[in-house]
Amino acid sequence: MAATAASAATAAPTGPAAPTGPAAPAASLVVLVDTGTEMPMAAFRDNQLVDGVHHDLGLALAARLGRQAVFLGLPRKRIALALEQGKADLICMYIPGWLPGNFHWSQPFFPMREVVVTDTTVPRPATLADLKGQTIATVLGYYHPDLVRVLGAGFVREDGPSNYSNLRKMVAGRLHHVVTQQSTLDYHQKTGERLSVYPPLLVKTYLGQCAVSPRGQVSVEAVNKAIVQIVKEGEVGQISARYQ
């Protein structure tokens, strides 16, 4: 009898599944971006990040983390405090020397090249040392320890608000040497008023990292796993190539 009852129970028809309702929205990944950043790194429209390396990289990392990217644009001076307070989860394309604070740093992964570019209206410098005593356009608030090491007191800065403002001054003939990222120079040559310049002098090559908030929603270990995935899948190279 027990077996018969069990068979009957097994054969009993099941009712329709209970409705599950809409899927819960994905958790967010709040990505900080400096509002002073320009293309190819970032483009803002109506205070919203809409394009650039920061945009594409944030989307790629969020996807690997199973989260929805939310971009928070802030002025450079407010970046560190917002990250320390957990108002954002991370900021990428930085290195520790640029962002002092109690942050967890990801593994280095995004290739970057700092260069000095010189226009062709002046003699071509053969080495960085040839720039000693000559004015070099820089961006206000950015530090260049490698140039300081080579030039010492001969590192003469002229600070501007952005890389693009400095390159526009070069177009206008107002200055002759600019320190910038190779990617910025390449993008300007592709999309802006083309500069007549010598091949740039390399200052430094390095790999950009992500600073992860100690009070954020994601751990640096999880971010590193996501980075390993996008590097292995070639997405870092694809993002970089998109803006060359």
What are these language model-derived features?
Residues 59, 68-131, 140-144, 199-203:
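Acidic, polar ligand-binding/catalytic clefts
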Residues 68-75, 155-169, 200:
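Short beta-strand-to-loop elements that line the ligand-binding cleft
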Residues 21-99, 138, 159, 223:
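Extracytoplasmic small-molecule ligand-binding "clamshell" domains
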Residues 47-60, 120-159, 168, 183:
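Bilobed "Venus flytrap"/periplasmic-binding protein-like clamshell domains
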Residues 58, 79-82, 166-169, 175, ...:
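Short, hydrophobic alpha-helical packing/hinge segments within bilobed ligand-binding/sensory domains
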Residues 35-37, 112-115, 190-228:
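Periplasmic-binding protein-like
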Residues 8, 68, 143-161, 193-196, ...:
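Ligand-binding clefts/hinges and TM-proximal coupling segments of bilobed small-molecule sensing domains
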Residues 52-64, 122, 129-135, 142, ...:
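Extended ligand-binding regions for polar small-molecule ligands
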